[in-house]
Amino acid sequence: MVGSSDGDQSDDSSHFERGVDHIYEAFICPLTKEVMHDPVTLENGRTFEREAIEKWFKECRDSGRPPSCPLTSQELTSTDVSASIALRNTIEEWRSRNDAAKLDIARQSLFLGNAETDILQALMHVRQICRTIRSNRHGVRNSQLIHMIIDMLKSTSHRVRYKALQTLQVVVEGDDESKAIVAEGDTVRTLVKFLSHEPSKGREAAVSLLFELSKSEALCEKIGSIHGALILLVGLTSSNSENVSIVEKADRTLENMERSEEIVRQMASYGRLQPLLGKLLEGSPETKLSMASFLGELPLNNDVKVLVAQTVGSSLVDLMRSGDMPQREAALKALNKISSFEGSAKVLISKGILPPLIKDLFYVGPNNLPIRLKEVSATILANIVNIGYDFDKATLVSENRVENLLHLISNTGPAIQCKLLEVLVGLTSCPKTVPKVVYAIKTSGAIISLVQFIEVRENDDLRLASIKLLHNLSPFMSEELAKALCGTAGQLGSLVAIISEKTPITEEQAAAAGLLAELPDRDLGLTQEMLEVGAFEKIISKVFGIRQGDIKGMRFVNPFLEGLVRILARITFVFNKEARAINFCREHDVASLFLHLLQSNGQDNIQMVSAMALENLSLESIKLTRMPDPPPVNYCGSIFSCVRKPHVVNGLCKIHQGICSLRETFCLVEGGAVEKLVALLDHENVKVVEAALAALSSLLEDGLDVEKGVKILDEADGIRHILNVLRENRTERLTRRAVWMVERILRIEDIAREVAEEQSLSAALVDAFQNADFRTRQIAENALKHIDKIPNFSSIFPNIA
């Protein structure tokens, strides 16, 4: 017909075709210029297409004109029309003859070897016939023309394939029998292939035909069974195609196919999840069970987990509460899947998951969950508590709940034990909940049983969870943990073995190192136990390996290294009671290592611990310094010894007046550590400054030549920095240490005179004199005397015997 969407020619062109009857003028409507379908006659005998003349009469009424004949302009007394039945029958007979002729022409033309123009014209005739009179589709089916059109999909011409697709769509519209014929063989597979291999117009025609076929429920299964069909259709709906029609038709095709639960599951696998969620919300109990079960097996990205939790979270929680065990199992597995992301876990909490979850976990009695499902419940609970949620007001951290958790850990198998330990890991990671967990563990004495998990070898996840939990507990239960580790054979050695494993750095190694690092550093028994198991040799080997780049594992390297350094530093706290500690530090040049670690920029704790260790090492220097042997005295020398000049020994330590080295006597001066420690006095972390200041103060201790110590500090520009620390008054502890050092520095008269007029220094000392603790006030008073801010009464009033 004229004006069709694919550019088909009108019927009046068909008279050029062989075997096609001429169009008689009486068949043509004067208004539409087309062959009439429903001719009617006016009172003046003129004949028009019914729809066209009715439209004409309406225009007359709307414009206020009397009805008239559009051909003669003659006014009519009535708008009544009479059907021209004889003419209509004649036209139908004529059309039937022509349609039969055109179909015959089409059958002769639809061969791949024919000219493209003949094929295109034949396809056009078929479309015209189907659009003109729907009953003629029966003729198309009987002529087996559909199969001939399908063959045109094999053409090498894009245009022929495109027109063949359009023709098939017209043929099957509203005709299930034609759809069934088209779906025979590999036609649907070909259409699916066209979705990705054809140009845009061809893809649009292919998806439009698939949409028509999908209106038949029987063919939905056929389409869904074609490999790649669903994933391509889903891909088209989510594409940014400029052809909106392709996206729309693909979407509507998938909507038609949602009647099949199997196809819905496949769609979900390819990312189209809403149909599955819809059935989970509104389906029958059997359907809900099926959808929930599949959801529990489906890989989901984090954004989708949030969507699922928001959409069906409440429904899944309701299923979990039901008395039907298969439904509870399906719901638990789905909730386990979507609770593993922080965003979705928070949504589930808002949907009320905690009360039934806790009930399922702890309940014993009728309809009790089997152990395998309790494991799933424990996993969900572990997922939820490890997102950092504020459980302060939740019943989960009540004393009774924590005790139940500890009891359950002691009375279940490894799988559930692991998940319950992960629950406690999450609770002890939260500042608000950790005190309650610590209290419950202390009062129940559970630390002994928790420590035993360190030795588990057949379940890596269980061991990791236990070590992470103990690491979280260690700042609050360090003494109890140290006692437990020393009191039971094997656990300490197991921790050391984990730390020393020759693998890329793991989370377990970092947690184990962090756990040992938190234990009391002055616990002699623990340090001796570590010496017995060779822990320090293994620790220092790991530290060297990390610094030299031999040990990999970027994710956990910083916490692991920090833990190792803190463990290693503990050996410097037992010099007075354990001779092996001195020997170890000498043999492994520990002082040099800590000196290098001072420069670990960005790792404040490592710098702080290294400075603390250097302080401890430096305090031993005076005991370890070797005095030079006196020169041999001969007979003449003994006679004239009273007039002989004193023997001068070169190379002696400036501060210890003996033979020193960093390795053998831990001397900060000989090791060049003073400048590096002074540099840390400008650190923004006050704890690093405190540790560096304490290490430097070891050069001014009683028993040393304070004047020489001050000179060494001055040469390293340390005095200026120490005075600045006092002026800044950042913390009470730092001020106390700075006042002690400044008082000793001001004993040197030249320095005292130089800084006496500095108002800021005087003000800082006065503030300490007035507000500090008793001991610091006394020291500040002495410092103020050195700069004549307080009179020295002992020099005014001589002692009276």
UniProtKB/Swiss-Prot annotation:
Tissues with expression: Expressed in leaves, root vasculature and guard cells.
Entry keyword set: Repeat, Transferase, Ubl conjugation pathway
Catalytic activity: S-ubiquitinyl-[E2 ubiquitin-conjugating enzyme]-L-cysteine + [acceptor protein]-L-lysine = [E2 ubiquitin-conjugating enzyme]-L-cysteine + N(6)-ubiquitinyl-[acceptor protein]-L-lysine
Deletion consequences: Premature senescence under low light conditions accompanied by enhanced ABA biosynthesis, accumulation of AAO3, and reduced photosynthetic capacity.
One Gene Ontology cellular component: nucleus
InterPro entries for the chain: ARM-like, ARM-type_fold, Armadillo, RING-Ubox_PUB, U-box_domain_protein, Ubox_domain, Znf_RING/FYVE/PHD
UniProt EC number: 2.3.2.27
ARM repeat ranges, renumbered to this chain: 134-173, 176-215, 218-259, 261-300, 301-340, 342-386, 390-429, 435-475, 480-521
Top class in the EC scheme: transferase
Involved pathway(s): Protein modification; protein ubiquitination
Keyword Transferase: yes
Domain U-box: residue ranges: 22-101
Record carries keyword Transferase: yes
GO MF annotation: an example: ubiquitin-protein transferase activity
Function of the protein: Functions as an E3 ubiquitin-protein ligase. Prevents premature senescence probably by targeting proteins involved in this process for degradation. Promotes the degradation of AAO3 and thus represses abscisic acid (ABA) biosynthesis.
Name assigned to this protein: U-box domain-containing protein 44
